[in-house]
Amino acid sequence: MENIVQKAKEEIKDVVLKALNEAKKEGLLNFESIQDVEVEEPKEKQHGDLATNFAMVMAREAKMAPRKIAEIIASKMNTSGTFIEKVEVAGPGFINFFLNQNFLIETLKLIHKRGKDYGRVNLGKGKKVQVEFVSANPTGPMHMGNARGGAIGDVLASILDYAGYNVSREFYINDAGNQIEKFGYSLEARYLQLLGIDAEVPEGGYHGEDIIDRAKEFLEIHGDKYKDVPSEERRKALIEYGLKKNIEKMKEDLVLYGIEYDVWFSEQSLYDSGEVYKVIEELTEKGYTYEKDGALWFKMTLFGAEKDDVLVRSNGVPTYLASDIAYHKNKFVTRGFDWVINVWGADHHGHVAPMKGAMKALGIDPNRLDVVLMQLVKLIEGGQVVRMSKRTGKMITLRDLIEEVGKDAARFFFNMRSPDSPIEFDLDLAKQQTNENPVFYVQYAHARICSIIRQLEEMGVKIENIEDVDLGLLKEEEEVDLIKKLAYFPEEITIAAKTLAPHRITRYVIDVASLFHSFYNSHRVKGAEENLMKARFALILAVKTVLKNALDILKVTAPERM
């Protein structure tokens, strides 16, 4: 058993179905087919620990008022040997279930037994999943969108790993195409300017300080060696140097941010291997392309897109769409991923339907591709929005953010809201060492527990075997609420993995910290009666395990002292 909440839900389903069949046998209910029993956590505590609207779902089939069905089912239930303490019928026909103390005791035993593996579930059954995220243009430093995408993608990968998937983290290097051409022309202009030659950064080129820095470094290494060579040769050397340095810098910054990739995949490699041209040929052979205005178009409207798009420009150069289709075919066919997840900025939403359509055209199930779209980031300081601009060079970079607030706060804050919600990142709040700062609040809970453990160990209090601890003594409301929240950790992992919702873990860990602080502010651990002290010791050890495991998923430090 890895998910005790799931076990309780299964018991409820079983009890409900047996009661339903018993009621039919006795002629109290009449129906032909049975709907699925959905068991959910109610929003209000007074509505029990778990609930089902099954009676409402069955009302039409049974030709009876849902409340009456619920009452009949409840009257026929046999809950002995289960985690169910009592059953109540509420409202128009909800059946609410309250869990017994055995559920609480088994939860704590399970956490102590599984330790650092508590929360892991086997949802994925070892399936190969790839999470591709950040994939920033290697033409300059990483910005706030990349910072948010990094936090979302990396935590998502950790959640999927916890959920039993075989996960690969990937960075797609956009080292081919139009922006690389502009990058080359921008570097060339700066290099020539440094040599005293009149040159201008082209329209739509890169004007940032980083471009000047790269040109200066190149000049220091090569001097005026490239002054009089043909422009194409000069740009090729500058691009090669600039990309190498920028990618090295990206890797350094991402490691500081807690992100290490399994694969760095080059777009250019898809051209070198011929995969881009092969996929264009395949789509053409299957009848999914046509020529218009000298260009080759992909019939995307066949797959639900609003309009067709160009695969090969009239000058014979493939578009970004063509290389991206080849890239996704490489993920599914060449490398055999069962599931591919891309974390993209919301401005790429128009690219989702074409990509899924292209997969369908290639005979790949488009449901194996998921795209998490994330909204924009606003940085707030002193109540004012801090503006940022990539092209003017006055941009706040990922490294600036890490230096300003630290890795922990950055990763935590970016995962506090769902990816599809815009985020206002309060720099002042992220630096506060107070309970107003959610990351401090959670870390303080962990440090506080470590402090209590040290004090208890100094007194000689220890738990040799959890079976010898009288966990039935934990009956106070704050204790019960806390244990029930701990029970939900594997369920949170399951839901977060199914719905690609990394913010669930951040919210969950805040809830655990809040319930722990409430418990500790109301009840003594040290100084309680001996058996109760041991039971509470077992409880706070379980809280520490869950906080540490959840913070590890977020790659946020769990400090032992603060």
From Swiss-Prot:
| Enzyme Commission number(s) | 6.1.1.19
Its annotated compartments are: Cytoplasm
Q: Where is this motif: 'HIGH' region?
A: 136-146
Q: Where is it mostly found?
A: cytoplasm
Q: Please name the GO terms of the biological process aspect recorded for this protein, alphabetically.
A: arginyl-tRNA aminoacylation
Is Metal-binding included in the keywords of this UniProt record? no
A GO cellular component term found in this entry reads: cytoplasm
- Which HAMAP family does the UniProt entry name for this protein? Arg_tRNA_synth
| Subunit relationships | Monomer.
Please state what the protein is called.
Arginine--tRNA ligase
From which organism does this entry originate?
Caldanaerobacter subterraneus subsp. tengcongensis (strain DSM 15242 / JCM 11007 / NBRC 100824 / MB4) (Thermoanaerobacter tengcongensis)
At the highest ranks, the source species' classification is: Bacteria, Bacillati, Bacillota, Clostridia, Thermoanaerobacterales
